[in-house]
Amino acid sequence: MTADSCNPCLTLENTIDVQEVPMTKSVVLADPRGFCAGVDRAILTVQTILKAAEASGKRTREDGLPPVYVRRQIVHNKHVVEDLAGQGAVFVQELAEIPDAAAQAGIPVVFSAHGVSPVVKAEAERRGMHVVDATCPLVGKVHREVLRFVREGYEIVYIGHKGHDEAVGVVGESPEHVHLIEHESDVDSLDFAPDTKLVLLSQTTLSVDETADTIAALKAKFPWIQEPPSSDICYATSNRQAAVKLVAQQSDCVVIVGSANSSNSVRLMEVAQEGLGERGKAYRVDDASELDPAWFEGLESVGISSGASVPDELVSGVIDALQNLGFTGMKSVETIKENMHFVLPAELRRKK
């Protein structure tokens, strides 16, 4: 990222203190794991607005309006959403749920890290809403690529999960020119003339491994299809999956902490299962309360990682639960140190 994209106030350091202890039963902890820079930025965006409202005495307003509205889950983790809601943020599915009085009062409306389509932005502008856009800069890059390629006359094949907030926003940039596919088998449904300018883009939370077969099928059917100069795959997606692969090799089972609607958390579980093979099973839990002690009977080592939207305290809770089950040893598997940071949205920086 450029120097302007760096903010020393945002850190991605994991907070769990790992001291390797050689014990019979142990936890194998993936590093990196948890919050990525885009998630950190999105959460801090809402927290900054809440703190400003608190400081100005506007957290509880006489008109009954909240200090901030957030369209959709700011990140795909229910604990993060519940925590921010407890501080006063109001989450809505659509802008129509926000009263006109809120727009007139200048109540901030935050767009989530996953991005939104031009239709949503146009509605917010029409209603005079004070928008703070917390779209992850890496997602924003894909939006800009769509617009550029459409201007240059391309048809765009976009690999993503149908219905995922990120995919909905990207496709919405130009629905008539962006063709969403999910799997290798979907390539058969595409039909382009040989003189069609084609380019391939993908959802940031997919991995290189996950898209490899689909990309190969696309290139086999449309040999002239182009790829952008740099990958759309998020660094955090690649890093977390690489760490989980190594953790799975050293574990009898793997627990991924993350919500069911988190694309990267679900994929981490799949990557872990692929790494385990027939030796063991991978599980996904929102928090320690969903652990089943029966999963760990007869095991010597349990691997742990978490999705990019997961606070480290939830991982700590899982570790504590496993320690109570006798997994008192601790080993960390580090594949890379992350130092990516994103500044707050421009709407908040202008206020400083």
Swiss-Prot record:
Pfam families: LYTB. Belongs to the IspH family. Pathway: Isoprenoid biosynthesis; dimethylallyl diphosphate biosynthesis; dimethylallyl diphosphate from (2E)-4-hydroxy-3-methylbutenyl diphosphate: step 1/1; Isoprenoid biosynthesis; isopentenyl diphosphate biosynthesis via DXP pathway; isopentenyl diphosphate from 1-deoxy-D-xylulose 5-phosphate: step 6/6. InterPro entries: LytB/IspH. Catalyzes the conversion of 1-hydroxy-2-methyl-2-(E)-butenyl 4-diphosphate (HMBPP) into a mixture of isopentenyl diphosphate (IPP) and dimethylallyl diphosphate (DMAPP). Acts in the terminal step of the DOXP/MEP pathway for isoprenoid precursor biosynthesis. Keywords: 4Fe-4S, Iron, Iron-sulfur, Isoprene biosynthesis, Metal-binding, Oxidoreductase. Its EC number is 1.17.7.4. GO terms for molecular function: 4 iron, 4 sulfur cluster binding; 4-hydroxy-3-methylbut-2-enyl diphosphate reductase activity; metal ion binding. Dimethylallyl diphosphate binds at H76, H114, H164, S262, S263, N264, S309. It catalyses: isopentenyl diphosphate + 2 oxidized [2Fe-2S]-[ferredoxin] + H2O = (2E)-4-hydroxy-3-methylbut-2-enyl diphosphate + 2 reduced [2Fe-2S]-[ferredoxin] + 2 H(+); dimethylallyl diphosphate + 2 oxidized [2Fe-2S]-[ferredoxin] + H2O = (2E)-4-hydroxy-3-methylbut-2-enyl diphosphate + 2 reduced [2Fe-2S]-[ferredoxin] + 2 H(+). Its cofactor is [4Fe-4S] cluster. [4Fe-4S] cluster binds at C36, C136, C234. HAMAP family: IspH. This is 4-hydroxy-3-methylbut-2-enyl diphosphate reductase. Isopentenyl diphosphate binds at H76, H114, H164, S262, S263, N264, S309. (2E)-4-hydroxy-3-methylbut-2-enyl diphosphate binds at H76, H114, H164, T204, S262, S263, N264, S309. Binds 1 [4Fe-4S] cluster per subunit. One of its GO terms (biological process) is terpenoid biosynthetic process. The active site is at E166 (proton donor).
